[in-house]
């Protein structure tokens, strides 16, 4: 079999297409928090019980940095919940809790040939690697940078859903409702 320029180009195009298809293939991960009896799960971050207790999943290990207070306070504030009704539990290992800022900082260890490709914390390579390896490491003070936005978004969406449910029950416009305690 002779190697021709056409065969080399076809091989390069096929290989590039397969690589690009693999990198851009959408991935979904199961919800790591299973609601218990009388609870409802909102994304990977919180469960709300019918008794009003809000349980927040914390994917970092508490080593004196206050992460088991910080993330639940963010959720409670965004949700409009009473702080006395907030419980904390360790999050299970899951791709949903991938620590992207730390994965980008540690890129020279997991991608030694081209670490500069992982400089952007929202980069495709960093996200694919961190989620694919369920990278949930606690280090380098990245708890707030890694988890504030997704925890806040989960709490905000839960607050909006609860306000919509209350508005439907009270027959008012949900934008007029406020969440307190």
Predicted regions and their residues:
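Cofactor-binding beta-sheet edge motifs in enzyme active sites
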Residues: 2-181
């Amino acid at each position: 079999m002779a190697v021709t320029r056409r065969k080399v180009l076809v091989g390069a195009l096929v290989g590039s297409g397969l690589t690009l298809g693999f990198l851009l293939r959408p991935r979904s991960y199961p919800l790591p928090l299973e609601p218990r009896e009388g609870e409802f799960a909102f994304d990977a971050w919180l469960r709300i019980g019918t008794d009003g207790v809000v349980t927040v999943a914390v994917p970092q290990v508490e080593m004196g940095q206050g992460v088991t207070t910080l993330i639940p306070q963010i959720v409670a504030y965004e949700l409009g919940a009473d702080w006395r009704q907030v419980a904390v539990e360790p999050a299970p290992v899951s791709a949903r809790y991938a620590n992207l800022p730390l994965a980008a900082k540690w890129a020279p260890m997991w991608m030694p040939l081209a670490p500069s490709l992982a400089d952007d914390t929202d980069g495709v390579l960093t996200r694919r690697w961190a989620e694919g390896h369920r990278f949930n490491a606690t280090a380098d003070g990245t708890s707030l940078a890694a988890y504030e936005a997704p925890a806040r978004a989960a709490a905000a969406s839960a607050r909006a859903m609860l306000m919509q449910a209350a508005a439907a029950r009270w027959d008012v416009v949900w934008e007029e409702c406020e969440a307190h305690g």
